Amino acid sequence: MKVTKLAVTILSSAIALSSFTAPLSAAPLSAENKQFLSAYEQVHQALAADDLAAAQKVAADLGPAGSELAKSKSLPEARDAFSHLSDTAKKITTDQPGYYVVHCPMLKKDWVQTSETITNPYSGSKMLHCGEIEKK
């Protein structure tokens, strides 16, 4: 009976430890994905600061992926375009350490950021800290 309990304890410990190491086994990001995520984070920060011009400038550097946002004529239009970039960012960062998927329940929008301090790119200064980290 003691051997069975010991085996169960060891097995349970091994399973628990493997859940902590799983994210570390994610494939490294490609140079292209790193560049995209760097620009994405800059656009995120610009929109959170209500800075349309800065968001457009960085989005233009993203090429075709950022063209819709780069051509936007207003913050609401830019924020709509940002949601497409967020979909891409969520896919790229799956299982990557250091990236957080955040959800704004009021606007029903998601984005990726590198800090646990929430800065909402969809609401800017109106609701800058509205959001919940859904995935680390």
Feature annotation, model-predicted:
Residues M1-A14:
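Bacterial N-terminal signal peptides that target proteins for export
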Residues S12, A16-K136:
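Intrinsically disordered, low-complexity terminal tails/loops enriched in metal-binding residues
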